[in-house]
Amino acid sequence: MTAVQRITVLGATGSIGLSTLDVIARHPERYQVYALSGYTRIDQLLALCVLHCPAYAVVPNGEAAVRLREGLAAAGCATEVLEGEAGLCEVAAAPEVDAVMAAIVGAAGLRPTLAAVEAGKKVLLANKEALVMSGALFMEAVRRSGAVLLPIDSEHNAIFQCLPGDYDRGLSQVGVRRILLTASGGPFRETPQADLADVTPEQACAHPNWSMGRKISVDSASMMNKGLELIEACWLFDAAPDKVEVVVHPQSVIHSLVDYVDGSVLAQLGNPDMRTPIANALAWPERIDSGVAPLDLFAIARLDFQAPDELRFPCLRLARQAAEAGNSAPAVLNAANEVAVEAFLERRIRFPEIAGMIEQVLAQEPVVPVPSLDAVFAADQRARELSREWLRRHGR
């Protein structure tokens, strides 16, 4: 019988975290929750602690810690509360932990995710920004520590499933011609370009196929999410940017494809539900029930494909340029995008200005080597300062 695996879920109150806990709860004989982290939804984190009884819960600061401790005491729950980035790194690298779900959104997830990698854990990577910001450093840490890195983004998980087990020999060595990264096109795929200046945060967050958090929903609407995924794919699979092609596929049934030199194209299909890649990574190399309904091909009936419109979605072009430039450019892209998306959600800028701000910041910030994590965060900080300066001049 398989030994019970102890899991740390970073970002437990978000969409990926909750889906992870749903899969874990279906297999109590296989998985036990070791630690959970949350950021603003402390009441929800409390409810999850009562339900899953983790050894630890991590919150951002002392005020949240006091509130959570009081709730845990009232519920008779023995979970110990830790604080801040140090607490996140502690539960990510703890000797008792077998696997870490890295689902904290944005740059905030980089250090704890890297802590899990450096401790040699099985890392379920949902935090694409960690690889976007620090790709070379991150992958070197994976090689050095012997960590097992399994992608959670549905597209990268699909690619992982379509590649041979020895793809780390090099894509050309295993006969791969190119990777086809699918994109739904988001909620504005057919919106007249002239109308994009008037779309609201609520419209941007109403994705036609996926249930996601607000930040990633806006990224999907701008297609920056696909741009970040392109950069992530380059690092995960050691692919040159020109070997990763984005294909718009509105139904979100084919999650990505791998094109081989013999003319074969392998694809992974499934209903658009994140529990599928989560279950795949949790159980890899085995398979477990995820709770996702079987795919009904007769109900789908048709699958459509088209090329992405980079005039409508300039974020995709900017991300590809950052991937080609390398060095600090992806970290700058990511930081500027985080500030821009937050400003859009706060109604301080219009939707097309997300790309406009990012392009200006990329033009202003020189591309420099990032040989250390400190250098990565320095580039990130400079980009955020330039973004805020742009907002002061152009924001509402």
From Swiss-Prot:
The UniProt record gives the binding positions of 1-deoxy-D-xylulose 5-phosphate as K128, S154, E155, S184, H207, S220, N225, K226, E229
Q: Which cofactor does it need?
A: Mg(2+); Mn(2+)
Q: Where does NADPH bind?
A: T13, G14, S15, I16, N127, E129, G213
> Among its keywords, does the record have Lipid biosynthesis?
no
- Please give the biological process terms from Gene Ontology that the record holds: isopentenyl diphosphate biosynthetic process, methylerythritol 4-phosphate pathway involved in terpenoid biosynthetic process
Per the similarity annotation, which family is this?
Belongs to the DXR family.
**Name of protein:** 1-deoxy-D-xylulose 5-phosphate reductoisomerase
Origin organism is Pseudomonas putida (strain W619)
Per UniProt, what is the name of the gene that codes for the protein in this document?
dxr
